[in-house]
């Protein structure tokens, strides 16, 4: 290189901006790498592998890394996600009773091509969006499936008022009431959607929701269309034991949040929900902003006051194990740990009365922590109980008759169970 060329190159290099500090293209992961990766089915190579490395002085490399962070689906954002990303529509179903007017709110993606309908019931203090990410994954595996995820009474956007509309009615979250609500919602959805008959149904309930769907399955009020039911992380024995410490747990929870983002952050940092994507869609439905907050710096409060539900706690879970084992239809119990099994269910498991699946890496909200795995288990569970795919073998008598006819035809003989009119017969 000539001296003239060298001096020209030095002059150009001197005008370039300072070298950008190096940083990894890999975005921050959720708080628990194992849960986060399995929740999305996405495996991100470790930074040490440097699969997309660029030279430190390369401006293109810096831009590439920036774009990767901005567009990567596993970003550490606490921005809320809308329900429309997971369901196709919402319904408001009005139920009139002697003392109240209830507006049930549900999220719906209708089934297609004779697909099944997964009816989802959340746990206490949660909402229908607790199943949002799981519903999305179910549809990826089984596109014809429908999802009906409800907001239970006094949860989410479901509201209960007196007949005059002047005030709220007394809180009633008894198992019997929640049972009637769920049956009404399914039937009213059928009417609203103009379905001539109900599609095949798989009931899915988490925690309190597990008790409700088991009660519905046991009483058979939705008829033979209920193929099966799945209970997520609740059994009678451990639930009754946990009630003793419920008040202490509630006293340790924050009562207010400065913003929705801080509410999402608390759920993920406390590991109440271990999947940030699910928290971003489900947590906003658990909170509402007070018009005149007592603490203006923290205007967001819980939509459902769990402490007020205490009178119903035992009513939800007493007799759950017995009903779960006795109800008609396929049975699935999905737990976050085998230590949750009580004696009755352990015996039932050894007798092969139900399917047991355990996700030890998940917390209590298994469908939120592990939506991909939960969806796969639920779809496989449906397929095992799908009557439309069942081909019954021919009866033994029919098989014997068919074999005899074939043998007689090959030998030119008359079938053993009938002779022609002109045939002779000796006793």
Swiss-Prot record:
Domain of life according to the entry: Eukaryota
Record EC number: 3.1.1.89
Keywords: Hydrolase, Serine esterase
Top-rank EC class of the record's enzyme: hydrolase
Database matches in InterPro entries: AB_hydrolase_1, AB_hydrolase_fold, PPase_methylesterase_euk
Pfam families in alphabetical order: Abhydrolase_6
GO molecular-function term, one example from the UniProt record: protein C-terminal methylesterase activity
Active site: 207, 233, 364
PANTHER family found in the cross-reference section: PROTEIN PHOSPHATASE METHYLESTERASE 1 (PTHR14189:SF0), PROTEIN PHOSPHATASE METHYLESTERASE-1 RELATED (PTHR14189)
Function comment: Demethylates proteins that have been reversibly carboxymethylated. Demethylates the phosphatase PP2A catalytic subunit.
Family in the record: Belongs to the AB hydrolase superfamily.
Protein name, UniProt field: Protein phosphatase methylesterase 1
Source organism of this protein record: Aspergillus oryzae (strain ATCC 42149 / RIB 40)
Organism taxonomic ancestry: Eukaryota, Fungi, Dikarya, Ascomycota, Pezizomycotina
């Amino acid at each position: 290189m000539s001296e003239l060329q060298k001096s020209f190159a030095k002059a150009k290099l001197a005008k370039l901006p300072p070298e950008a500090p190096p940083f990894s293209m890999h975005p921050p992961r959720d708080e628990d790498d194992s849960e986060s990766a399995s929740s999305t089915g996405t495996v991100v190579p470790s930074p040490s592998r440097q699969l997309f490395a660029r030279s430190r002085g390369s401006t293109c490399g810096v831009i590439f890394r920036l774009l990767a962070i901005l567009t990567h689906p596993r970003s550490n954002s606490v921005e809320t996600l809308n329900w429309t990303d997971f369901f196709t529509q919402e319904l408001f179903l009005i139920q009139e009773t002697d003392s109240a007017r209830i507006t049930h709110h549900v999220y719906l993606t209708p089934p297609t091509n004779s697909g099944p309908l997964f009816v989802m019931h959340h746990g206490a203090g949660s909402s229908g969006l607790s199943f949002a990410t799981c519903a999305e994954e179910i549809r990826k595996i089984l596109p014809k499936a429908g999802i009906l995820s409800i907001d239970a009474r006094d949860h989410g956007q479901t509201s209960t008022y007196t007949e005059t509309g002047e005030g709220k009615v007394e809180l009633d979250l008894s198992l019997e009431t929640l049972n009637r609500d769920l049956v009404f919602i399914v039937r009213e959805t059928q009417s609203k959607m103009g379905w001539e008959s109900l599609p095949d149904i798989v009931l899915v309930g988490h925690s309190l929701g597990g008790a409700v769907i088991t009660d519905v399955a046991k009483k058979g009020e939705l008829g033979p269309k209920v193929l099966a039911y799945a209970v997520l992380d609740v059994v009678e024995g451990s639930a009754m034991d946990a009630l003793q410490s419920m008040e202490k747990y509630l006293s340790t929870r924050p009562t207010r949040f400065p913003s929705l983002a801080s509410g999402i952050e608390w759920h993920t940092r406390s590991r109440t929900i271990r999947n940030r994507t699910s928290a971003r869609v489900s947590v906003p439905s658990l909170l509402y902003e007070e018009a005149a907050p007592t603490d203006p710096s923290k205007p967001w409060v819980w939509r459902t006051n769990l402490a007020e539900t205490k009178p119903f706690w035992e009513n939800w879970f007493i007799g759950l194990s017995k009903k779960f084992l006795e109800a008609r239809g396929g049975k699935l119990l999905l737990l976050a740990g085998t230590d949750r099994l009580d004696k009755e269910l352990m015996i039932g498991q050894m007798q092969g009365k139900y399917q047991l699946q355990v996700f030890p890496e998940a917390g209590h909200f298994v469908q939120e922590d592990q939506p991909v795995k939960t969806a796969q288990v639920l779809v496989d569970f449906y397929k095992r109980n799908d009557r439309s795919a069942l081909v019954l073998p021919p009866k033994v008598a029919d098989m014997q008759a068919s074999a005899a006819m074939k043998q007689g035809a090959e030998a030119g003989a008359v079938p053993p169970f009938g002779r022609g009119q002109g045939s002779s017969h000796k006793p």
